[in-house]
Amino acid sequence: MDLTLIYTVVGFALAGYSVIANDSIQTLGTFIASKKKWFKWYVLAGSASSVMIIALAWGWYSYDGDISYGRLTRIPYQEIQWYHAVAPAILLLLTRVGIPVSTTFLVLSAFASTVVLEKMLMKSVVGYGLAAMVAYIAWIAVSKFINEKFDEVDDKWIGFWRNSVWISSGWLWWVWLSHDVANIAVYLPRQLDITILLTVMAYFTILLFYIFYIQGGRIQAVVLEKTGTRYARSATIINVIYAAVLFYFKELNDLPMSTTWVFVGLLCGRE
């Protein structure tokens, strides 16, 4: 078998597992925390998988076979070498010990030029600052009216807040995918045929079901440490702010950025 093909398959498989196990929990963590008491893990996994399949299909359709939503426009496809597979392997090790790291820089640094990396760094720094500022302002305002531990939700609003978690989590998950799928798709041709697309969808679905089965793994512990992530109102606010910041930068330009930095900025501002 051609070594390039082996490196491609290994790199893609490791990147897929590492990204889904690491960054996706930063995105879906509040969803798992606030819903696991009410729904079986496979129901939650099925919901997340459905959004993922739709997001990948839409990106593939809208961007002429490119599931990265155009994030890799400035990073041309390269023949995969052994060192390209090292980055996701390191990421996998860090994930196993529960360290949330930036998959974007760890993976794409093996492919991108210095100029592109500098622009990615600047975009991520701005994303961190914006998320921290928005979260800080939002929680100052919200804390004046809501204390999840003591202010119970009025019965007539319970359904609204529980449903809002589903909607906001779905939006956040789609926006996140439009950013971070690039960290996996970088190992694949920029235009995928339908067979490869279906294979990618199947692999991601298996990974998602596994991650939900283990309830997020060690990275989920980082999310659970933050006050309020188990509550529907706080989970919704976290989701909306995170998704809004990511959506803004998605529309800003086609440069990849670190969603982990935005996540950390959000938690920093909130704390």
What feature does the model see in each segment?
Residues 1-271:
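Multi-pass alpha-helical transmembrane bundle typical of ion/small-solute transporters
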